[in-house]
Amino acid sequence: MKLGYKLLFGACVAANLVATSCVDDMKFGNSFLEKAPGGSATIDTVFGSVIYTQQFLNSIYGRQYYGLPYKDDTSLPVSSSPYCGKIEALTDCWQLHWRDAQLYTQYYSGIHTANYGRRQDKFCYNDEKVWEVVRWCWLLLENIDRVPNLDENEKARMIAEAKCLMAVRYFDMFRHYGGLPLLTASFEGNESSYECPRATVEETVNFMIKLLDEAINSGALPWAYGVGDDADGSSTYVGRWTMAGAMALKCKIWQFAASPLFNDNQGYAGGASEAEQQHLVWYGGYRQELWDNCLKACEDFMRELQARGFYELNHSVNTTPAGYRYAYRMGYLYQGSKEVLHSVRVQMGDAFNSSTYFWHNW
């Protein structure tokens, strides 16, 4: 089974870099996604400056998956729109306070099918900015050696961060679709073909784990950002990928891969579909070694945690139910919580009646 690269290429073309006439007015975010006038001048501009390269990496961070619907904007993952909703709202994690979110109307009414439109799926294949992030990360990896006066330690860290960003965005989609096309370079726009076979579940998992292993083993990522234990002391960098975050994501990937969703004696949908026959949505049988891999990844993390410290559970000030409940809430509510292994943050602004529709307005 093959998936045409046309969808991927269409998404990636929209992410071309743009050069500006004023060096101090480099545009990122929405403006940064405008179509470039042509040639490689835009790449030369971005990777001709340490500051611009840092800003480019920052723009990639801005397309991570965020747990709350916070803005309806086509430059952001479509699940960021309150109109769409979040997959977590179908679990016991939390609820949407607007009953007409597409996630609710499609699933709870039992009318969800593969023929969905924009905002109607729990995780859209080509509108979650996954492929844009993958392309941007490859652009950074392919061009970072060109950046003049970039400190070697910072360069190594940025490379490791880009690999983590690719891995986490692949995982965001993997848990919904299974095997995915594996992109190993950026596109220039003049390739003769954009067709690529969809990888198996096993190949996709190995691809994500390889990216994380390279980031972890590079030694370029600090264990934590903040003050205390083995943290680097820079609280302004909180939210960037760390060694702890990368190791934790590795545990999560193996856990999903080993779960009955992908790892069982029979395919989730019975085993007769084309996707199941080609092992695109499961491993093709039960494998105990997947749980062994998950266990080892967890043991590796706990061993590092014991040696390095910093992260810990919040403790109740007393033994009452209210005390434990408060400690639990502060674990995810408090911005400086040491329970958080990787923090994804957004910073937006909306005026009254601006139609940007923040989650707090619903």
Question: What role is predicted for each listed range?
Answer:
Residues 10-16:
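Bacterial N-terminal signal peptides
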Residues 191-203, 286-290, 295-297:
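Structural transition elements
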Residues 177-183:
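Short, flexible active-site-proximal loops enriched in glycine and acidic residues
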Residues 186-190:
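Short edge-strand/loop segments of extracellular domains
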Residues 42-72, 95-177, 192-233, 238:
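Conserved, well-structured interaction surfaces
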Residues 23-102, 180, 213-214, 240-247, ...:
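An aromatic- and glycine-enriched ligand-binding surface/loop that stacks and positions planar moieties
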Residues 18-21:
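C-terminal motif of bacterial Sec signal peptides marking the signal peptidase cleavage site
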Residues 1-8:
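Bacterial N-terminal signal peptides that target proteins for export
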